[in-house]
């Protein structure tokens, strides 16, 4: 997905981005991190249902279709790496927070949404319902998920 490598920052509509940031900050403050991330995961699953992907014949097709949807949201891009018993998903170019919510909390909240989104898309492609997309680690620039 070399054409996406230069996509490091995105513009966001004023007001809308602020609302999302305030909502995430409020969820984390009022519900706690674990409950907020569970809720955000389910919101990602809802987005996957609202923006379904066409049936993919190859991993490359799936990656392309995921990236087309992510581009609609200006949420960066993903690279899929099939393994023997897993698929690694590397999400790059996350939208930067507004600076009000600390970067770690912002990225954790977005990671929860993305995990739900990717999980919903993968289940719709025939993936097992019992297998979840989980964040392996965040290196500060890239979110590394495992399915």
For each feature predicted by the language model, list its residue ranges:
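N-terminal accessory segment detector
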Residues: 1-97, 101-108, 138
